[in-house]
């Protein structure tokens, strides 16, 4: 075996490899010798088939099988001796001329091939004990609990007919029928019958609900509006429209009395039990938000302290996945790059940066996990599957079967568990300080937020 490195460009490596015909022949002979005691041929006793006869019958297929195995073993040896961790599957270029292939299979010629790969860079991990991470913590206030219960009450409130001669006010529920036109022409989706709308709920396009204030039952009005420029249907986006609208029923919201009886309608023994449940849910929500903020800060820190070239092929794969998703989302929502105030080139550049970050962080997290023997147990994966099944009542068996028979889906379920365990490992070493914040501060938008790995 002869190996010559021909390319060492960044993370790209390429080798020219020669496997001598004599070495291939020796492997073929050993394989045929092993076969002679197992092959059954008419006219020969078991174990008495001449090697020459076997070679005439099986020589070509055995040689091809042997060459394939030798290439695999040789490549493994090349990569192992050099300490390579592969980022991509090896790309092998074999002789293509028919006469060359025939010479190799006949054992008359050496096999010359090239193998090209991208390797994972050597990653020098930072000292995680030097990391300082601020952990925002928000306490659940009584006012938060009251607000949550008020929202529940608002969502469950009843409405009563306002009676003859009444006019619609903000907060009222109005049942309407409408016919929409653009430049006098009806359009798809512009007609509705018996539609209920709560004035002020912002469920209709801007300006529509406000023009219902003062309308009476049986009254017809022409509402003039303009579809938002980022409207989901691109054919309607930014266009002015008129809706001939008739109100058929006017209803006023009834005040909800938040007491034990109200709690019982929701399945709780008392108002105190309802408040207890609401506090527990809010506590879990705040803890989840805290976790996401801490994780984001930590991933940003890992990004800052681990700057290296990511394997281009992995970045391209990640970008392709993201870009297909973005394009599909834009098409389904009727959006364009112009409506999003950008260009396709600028968007691609931004998402390539995100793809590069994701790949680098993925490699860093993998390196940390590998060096510190962090693993995901089968029990942890099973619990995740069970939790996913609980989210789909009535389809638990189908969910379980889906993951049991889909290795890729199971790997996708395992990945975030692994990531969280690595994050927890780093946080154990880092200097984490808690900071009490308000609910608003905990949930505020962070302009510096970056897409996590």
Curated annotation (Swiss-Prot):
Name the predominant localization.
cytoplasm
Question: Where in or outside the cell?
Answer: Cytoplasm
The protein's superkingdom reads: Bacteria
The biological process GO terms on file are:
'de novo' cotranslational protein folding; cell division; chaperone-mediated protein folding; protein transport; protein unfolding
Which regions form coiled coils? Answer: none
Ranges for domain PPIase FKBP-type come to 171-256
Single Gene Ontology MF annotation: peptidyl-prolyl cis-trans isomerase activity
What InterPro entries is this protein classified in? PPIase_dom_sf, PPIase_FKBP_dom, Trig_fac, Trigger_fac_C, Trigger_fac_C_sf, Trigger_fac_ribosome-bd_bac, Trigger_fac_ribosome-bd_sf, Trigger_fact/SurA_dom_sf
PANTHER family recorded for this chain?
Answer: TRIGGER FACTOR CHAPERONE AND PEPTIDYL-PROLYL CIS/TRANS ISOMERASE (PTHR30560), TRIGGER FACTOR-LIKE PROTEIN TIG, CHLOROPLASTIC (PTHR30560:SF3)
Identify this protein by name: Trigger factor
Native organism = Rhodopseudomonas palustris (strain BisB18)
């Amino acid at each position: 075996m002869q190996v010559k490195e021909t390319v060492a460009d960044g993370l790209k490596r390429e080798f020219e490899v020669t496997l001598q015909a004599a070495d291939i022949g020796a492997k073929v002979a050993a394989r045929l010798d092993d076969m002679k005691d197992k092959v059954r041929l008419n006219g020969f006793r078991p174990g008495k088939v001449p090697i020459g006869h076997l070679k005439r019958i099986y020589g070509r297929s055995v040689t091809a099988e042997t060459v394939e195995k030798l290439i695999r073993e040789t490549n493994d040896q090349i990569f192992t001796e050099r300490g390579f961790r592969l980022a991509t599957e090896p790309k092998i270029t074999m002789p293509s001329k028919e006469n060359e292939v025939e010479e190799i299979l006949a054992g008359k010629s050496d096999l010359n091939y090239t193998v090209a790969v991208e390797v994972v860079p050597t990653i020098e991990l930072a000292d995680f004990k030097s990391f300082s991470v601020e952990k925002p913590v928000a306490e659940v206030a009584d006012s938060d609990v009251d607000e949550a219960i008020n929202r529940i009450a608002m969502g469950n409130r009843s409405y009563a007919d306002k009676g003859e001669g009444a006019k619609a006010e903000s907060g009222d529920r109005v049942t309407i029928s409408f016919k929409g036109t653009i430049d006098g022409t009806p359009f798809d989706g512009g007609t509705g019958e018996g539609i209920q709308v709560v004035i002020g709920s912002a469920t209709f396009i801007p300006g529509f609900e406000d023009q219902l204030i003062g309308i009476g039952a049986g009254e017809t009005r022409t509402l003039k509006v303009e579809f938002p420029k980022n409207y989901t249907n691109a054919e309607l986006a930014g266009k002015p429209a008129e809706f001939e609208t008739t109100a058929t029923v006017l209803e006023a919201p009834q005040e909800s009395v938040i007491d034990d009886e109200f709690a019982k309608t929701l399945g709780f023994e008392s108002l105190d039990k309802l408040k207890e449940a609401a506090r527990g849910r809010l506590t879990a929500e705040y803890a989840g938000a805290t976790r996401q903020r801490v994780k984001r800060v930590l991933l940003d820190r890992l990004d800052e302290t681990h700057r290296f070239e990511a394997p281009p092929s992995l970045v391209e794969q990640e970008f392709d996945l993201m870009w297909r998703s973005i394009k599909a989302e834009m098409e389904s929502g009727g959006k364009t790059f112009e409506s999003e105030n950008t260009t396709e080139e600028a968007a691609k550049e931004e998402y390539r940066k995100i793809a590069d970050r994701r790949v680098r962080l993925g490699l860093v997290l993998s390196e940390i996990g590998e060096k510190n023997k962090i693993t995901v147990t089968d029990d942890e994966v099973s619990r995740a599957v069970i939790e996913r099944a609980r989210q789909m009542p009535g389809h638990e068996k189908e969910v379980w079967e889906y993951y049991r028979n889909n290795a890729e889906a199971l790997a996708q379920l395992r990945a975030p568990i692994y990531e969280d365990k690595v994050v927890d490992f780093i946080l154990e070493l880092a200097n984490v300080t808690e900071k009490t914040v308000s609910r608003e501060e905990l949930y505020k938008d962070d302009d510096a937020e970056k897409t996590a790995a």
